[in-house]
Amino acid sequence: MSTNPKPQRKTKRNTNRRPQDVKFPGGGQIVGGVYLLPRRGPRLGVRATRKTSERSQPRGRRQPIPKARRPEGRAWAQPGYPWPLYGNEGLGWAGWLLSPRGSRPSWGPTDPRRRSRNLGKVIDTLTCGFADLMGYIPLVGAPLGGAARALAHGVRVLEDSVNYATGNLPGCSFSIFLLALLSCLTIPASAYEVRNVSGVYHVTNDCSNSSIVYEAADLIMHAPGCVPCVRENNSSRCWVALTPTLAARNTSIPTTTIRRHVDLLVGAATFCSAMYVGDLCGSVFLVSQLFTFSPRRHETLQDCNCSIYPGHLSGHRMAWDMMMNWSPTTALVVSQLLRIPQTVVDMVTGAHWGVLAGLAYYSMVGNWAKVLIVMLLFAGVDGTTHVTGGATGHTTSGIASLFLPGASQKIQLINTNGSWHINRTALNCNDSLNTGFLAALFYTHKFNASGCPERLASCRSIDGFDQGWGPITYTEPGDSDQKPYCWHYAPQRCSVVSAADVCGPVYCFTPSP
């Protein structure tokens, strides 16, 4: 008799079974003994529940759940938005009308025209139509058509790259309108002016007619690297260069008129960007640059041989300008960057609401590249006479000269025949101490100023002159006590000398050819 227990038949009571999932009509369900709430929101797809009679049949292929479609139509404030007011559709019809009759066949899913929008519709339709026409040429149609198709795909890849770079880089969402603004600044600054006289070409600083951008009553906007020479009253005269791209009749002319143009331009750019039609406005602006806005008001010539910068010429300033002229575009950008602090003050005090609105809008949306472009555009018409790289370098050298130790050798002045000499070089008394601020502090005890009191004794004090009245005019020094080392010495007026009367080489501070 066996001692093993009697095997029992498994029933529903003693079988360890997993709890079944229960679904309720309201959408809730019990999964693993846990009640799940019904899913809220729109359901993208519903799988059909199999009937009891179908459970023994093989399961068919399950249909995928459809994905949410990208909304079509106006997608405002999104990269790659279509132009409103049927601009996108209108350009599509324009491309269809401009395309040849042979460009109707489709290229399949890789058709560049499927991914184009706005101006890309016209470009891709023309390139694809040209490829289709090349394919219809007998004998050589196959290779030419293939090459033209590859060219069309290359143009599409270039457009996609530009769209990605201009729409996804942070702070650099460029548009055609921004490129149009850049066209105002990136004029060919590296070109030098040439004057043709009887078949002989002369390099000059005078602006040619092709370098004149805009003319006002007292202002001329021109290409950088030249100065306008205007003929007035049967005589040619150089205008004063206020900025590298702006010249005026004289230094007292305000730049308010030009600044109002920049106000209007930046205000229009801000409005177009806020309405998301910047590409359309930029296209209109680029096309309008092909035409002349205003007639010529001044007669510009090239017989003055003007200087790029006004004022006194020092050796440091001359060397700085010659170095900066090797790269005029760099000189233009550096000159405008150095004027930005003063430009910010002028924006507020001058109530330039268009520029201020543009800066505020572009700063809020994070387009820092546009903020910089607007600042440079406004700084380009900043009215000041110290704007060239030479003036900046001269100011920097003046500040740095305060900390130069200077010469430490003993300075000995020698009076020979009424002239003062130091190492066989003529020098006046005051220039001997022009060796730096620190040198004047530490080396004055080594300076032999014997003879200077005798020379300065002939100079008069301030009470030796009569009280003047009326406007300030030039005076001609005629007295014997008017010496260059006296404080009351009045230098003679500068005269204009024609370059043809100068004996020796004429140095032109224009960009090197």
Curated annotation (Swiss-Prot):
Instruction: Outline the segment boundaries, as ranges, of region: Important for endoplasmic reticulum and mitochondrial localization.
Output: 112-152
Annotated Low complexity bias: 32-47
Q: Give the Cytoplasmic membrane side ranges.
A: 2-168
Modified residues annotated as Phosphoserine in this record: 53, 99, 116
Q: Which GO terms describe its biological process?
A: clathrin-dependent endocytosis of virus by host cell; fusion of virus membrane with host endosome membrane; symbiont-mediated suppression of host innate immune response; virion attachment to host cell
Q: Which Gene3D superfamilies match?
A: Hepatitis C Virus Capsid Protein, Chain A, Hepatitis C virus envelope glycoprotein E1, chain C
Alphabetically list the UniProt keywords. Acetylation, Apoptosis, Capsid protein, Clathrin-mediated endocytosis of virus by host, Fusion of virus membrane with host endosomal membrane, Fusion of virus membrane with host membrane, Glycoprotein, Host cytoplasm, Host endoplasmic reticulum, Host lipid droplet, Host membrane, Host mitochondrion, Host nucleus, Host-virus interaction, Inhibition of host innate immune response by virus, Interferon antiviral system evasion, Membrane, Oncogene, Phosphoprotein, Ribonucleoprotein, RNA-binding, Transmembrane, Transmembrane helix, Ubl conjugation, Viral attachment to host cell, Viral envelope protein, Viral immunoevasion, Viral nucleoprotein, Viral penetration into host cytoplasm, Virion, Virus endocytosis by host, Virus entry into host cell
Q: Where are the transmembrane segments?
A: 169-189, 359-379
Q: Where is this region: Interaction with APOA2?
A: 122-173
GO terms, molecular function: RNA binding; structural molecule activity
Region Interaction with STAT1: start and end of each range? Answer: 2-23
Q: Which domain of life is it from?
A: Viruses
Identify the stretch(es) annotated as Important for lipid droplets localization: 164-167
Which cysteines share a disulfide bond? none
Q: Where is this region: HVR2?
A: 474-479
Q: Where can the motif Nuclear localization signal be found?
A: 5-13, 38-43, 58-64, 66-71
Region: Disordered, residue numbers: 2-75
| Residues covered by region (CD81-binding 1) | 480-493
Q: Region HVR1: what ranges?
A: 385-411
Lumenal face residues: 190-358, 380-513
Record-linked InterPro entries? HCV_Core_C, HCV_core_chain_A, HCV_core_N, HCV_Env, HCV_NS1
Which residues does this entry assign to the site Cleavage? 177-178, 191-192, 383-384
The ranges of region (Important for fusion) come to 265-296
Q: What else is known?
A: Viral particle assembly takes place at the surface of ER-derived membranes in close proximity to lipid droplets. NS2 associates with E1/E2 glycoproteins, NS3 and NS5A, which interacts with the viral RNA and core protein to promote genome encapsidation. The nucleocapsid buds at the ER membrane where E1/E2 glycoproteins are anchored and afterward associate with nascent lipid droplet to acquire APOE and APOC. Secretion of viral particles is probably regulated by viroporin p7.
| Family of this protein | Belongs to the hepacivirus polyprotein family.
What is the recorded name of this protein?
Genome polyprotein
Give the organism, scientific name: Hepatitis C virus (isolate HC-J2)
Taxon lineage: Viruses, Riboviria, Orthornavirae, Kitrinoviricota, Flasuviricetes
